[in-house]
Swiss-Prot record:
Main location: host cell
Function: Plays a role in transformation by modulating the activities of cellular proteins involved in control of cell proliferation and by acting as a functional homolog of an activated tyrosine kinase-associated growth-factor receptor. Recruits upon association with Ppp2/PP2A the Src tyrosine kinase component Fyn, thereby activating its kinase activity. In turn, MT becomes phosphorylated and mediates signal transduction pathways leading to cell cycle progression and cell division. MT also plays a role in regulation of early and late gene expression as well as viral DNA replication.
Residue intervals passing through the bilayer: 375-395
Region (Disordered): 213-235
Keyword presence, Transcription regulation: no
Intervals, Extracellular compartment: 396-401
Protein's recorded name: Middle T antigen
Keywords assigned: Early protein, Host membrane, Host-virus interaction, Membrane, Oncogene, Phosphoprotein, Transmembrane, Transmembrane helix
Segments in the Cytoplasmic topological domain: 1-374
Database matches in Gene3D superfamilies: DnaJ domain, Small t-antigen, unique domain
Length: 401
């Protein structure tokens, strides 16, 4: 990022983009400024043609340099496309699940650097950082050569904390996914739901004609990187395959329109698996009968009873009967000791209680100290009085002699 353009070209591009120097390196912000300036400086809009040509030249040089830096890093596990053939950003690749795929759990993903087994985007780029340093044998990397969160924080001078993750997500969103050298099929997928069950295995495994495709690379919409077809042996060790072999009756729950390739997540089935007949509209009859049928469609409401009508003052002859409530099952597991707390206290209450006990213990210690001081002072005064009394008697005795 700092060696693609010269110092003069960098200052010229910053002035043409009306960009603050502190945002140099923020590709998304620079791209927005570039598009805005293109609308202002375009000759058809009445702009300056020379400035427009200079802006296009510098921006193209910067973009080609960033692409070339990532291309020359070494062998890639995914297919490399041309700079004009791949314009899909990282956020467009993952669309609605981008922010959940970026960081799976910030508490652990930010703490574990080289030993993380997570496959979110943040952890994958961090692992890529160590692999690049090992392959290049360089002491450090800068933004543009590596897009991990550590290089991002070092470039902009920010601490790596939980508050940095949203800024890092906004920074990575407009960057082309091909620059990141990520296999999008290996990125953490937080989508929840059922997976379509595989069809039942044939009687003869060798006669199966179902071919499965394995693909790699960041391509979408059917553009596969490497296609390797293998023959299905009819044995599936997945959960869906075992469920299919153990309970073949579950096939009847799936609708016929849900015949799509296996492995595609679909939302879970509704709560009511069996069809329920809709209520038949009432036939035009008398007005009173129609109104009664409409009211029967809804759940009957409890009769409204005034509170004061249910209260009775107890007399001396009549005693109040105790009202017993049904005890839930989980209460049977509670201890029989009534002094034991049944509800968990919060952390704030525990800290206040601990502080109160500490304060009380401190007060008791201070009282003991005061008592000890008084005792020592009393002993000192008594000894001092005895000393002066002895001295007085000695002087008086000498005077008589």
């Amino acid at each position: 990022m700092d060696r693609i353009l010269t110092k003069e070209e960098k200052q010229a591009l910053i002035s043409l983009l009306d960009l603050e120097p502190q945002y140099w390196g923020d590709y998304g912000r620079m791209q927005k400024c570039y598009k805005k300036k293109c609308l202002q400086l375009h000759p058809d809009k009445g702009g300056n043609e020379e400035l427009m040509q200079q802006l296009n030249t510098l921006w193209t040089k910067l973009k080609d340099g960033l692409y070339r830096v990532r291309l020359l890093l070494g062998p890639s596990q995914v297919r490399r496309l041309g700079k004009d053939q791949w314009n899909l950003s990282l956020q467009q690749t993952f669309s609605g699940t981008y922010f959940r795929r970026l960081c799976r759990l910030p508490i652990t993903c930010l703490r574990n650097k080289g030993i993380s087994t997570c496959n979110c985007i943040l952890c994958l780029l961090r692992k890529q950082h160590f692999l690049l340093k090992k392959s290049w044998r360089v002491p450090c990397l800068v933004l543009g050569e590596c897009y991990c969160i550590d290089c991002f924080a070092l470039w902009f001078g920010l601490p790596v904390t939980n508050m940095l993750v949203p800024l890092y997500a906004q920074f990575l969103a407009p960057i082309p996914v091909d620059w990141l050298d990520l296999n999008v099929h290996e990125v953490y997928n937080p989508a929840s739901g059922m997976t379509l069950m595989l069809p039942p295995p044939p009687a003869d495994p060798e006669s199966s004609t179902i071919l499965t495709q394995e693909d790699t690379g960041p391509t979408l919409m059917g553009q596969q990187d490497t296609l390797t077809s293998r023959r299905n042996t009819g044995k599936s060790f997945s959960l869906s395959g075992m469920l299919m072999r153990t309970s073949p009756a579950k096939k009847s729950y799936h609708h016929q329109k849900m015949n799509s390739p296996p492995g595609i997540p679909i939302p879970p089935p509704p709560l009511f698996l069996f069809p329920v007949t809709a209520p038949v509209p009432p036939v035009t009859r008398n007005t009173q009968e129609t109104q009664a049928e409409r009211e029967n469609e809804y759940m009957p409401m409890a009769p409204q009873i005034h509170l004061y009508s249910q209260i009775r003052e107890p007399t001396h002859q009549e005693e109040e009967e105790p009202q017993y409530e049904e005890i839930p099952i989980y209460l049977e597991l509670l201890p029989e000791n009534p002094n034991q707390h049944l509800a968990l206290t919060s952390t704030a209450r525990r800290s206040l209680r601990r502080k109160y006990h500490k304060h009380n213990s401190h007060i008791i210690t201070q009282r003991q100290r005061n008592r000890l001081r008084r005792l020592v002072l009393m002993i000192f005064l008594l000894s001092l009085g005895g000393f002066f009394l002895t001295l007085f008697f000695l002087i008086k005795r000498k005077m008589h002699l």
